[in-house]
Amino acid sequence: MKILIPTAKEMNTDHPCIEALPLREESQAVLDSLAHYSASELETFYKVSAEKAEEEYAHIQALKDHRAKHYPALKLFDGLMYRHIKRDGLTEAEQTYLENHVLITSALYGVVPALSPMAPHRLDFLMKLKVAGKTLKSHWKSAYDEALQDEDLIFSLLSSEFETVFSKEIREKMVTFKFMEDKGGQLKIHSTISKKARGAFLTALIEEQVQTVEQARKLRFAGFDYRPDLSSDLELVFVKQA
């Protein structure tokens, strides 16, 4: 069983560095494509300020020149979902579960264990980067599938942009999750609630050592309860009262 989570734009480098691993062939090809951009071109590519573009340019060049500092990916990313994941003070069993089951899907590094070394970078599958004439999704599809081909059960906490990198065959093994808020009988979904809930849900999976869909259905976390009436075999819905 594997649990998939996406990367995040926000990063926190206030952690001890760890040793880098050599970039895999697919990652090197992506980096080579990114390295063609000047800082001013990155401003347009990323749709960010000149200052942010300079920062990203420095990140790319540092990776290219093997100067980049690397951090455990789960600690490097610091978006809303990540801030709601239990990342410190884990028991030995929780640490083992995290290492064995949680994978991060990256447009630069591929599908990798959650504590793999990553350098600060900004890239997702909505960005129109061409790698050897292919889109990012096409470039990564076979490697993404390969990472999960032996898995019978996959819990996906990904957004659709990441899920659609995988083939239909792999996606059919995925159990997805929806987190909703009940406001006076009206069920609402919004980004902030979903991101926080994904982090809290992953924490519950880790703490309870969940291995099956049946175990996942029994979880209660951050005010969320499983709603069988709204769920299906491959989509579990959890609702909290507003």
Q: Residue spans of the language-model regions?
A:
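Internal, well-folded beta-alpha domain core
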Residues: 86-242
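Short hydrophobic beta-strand segments
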Residues: 2-6, 153-156
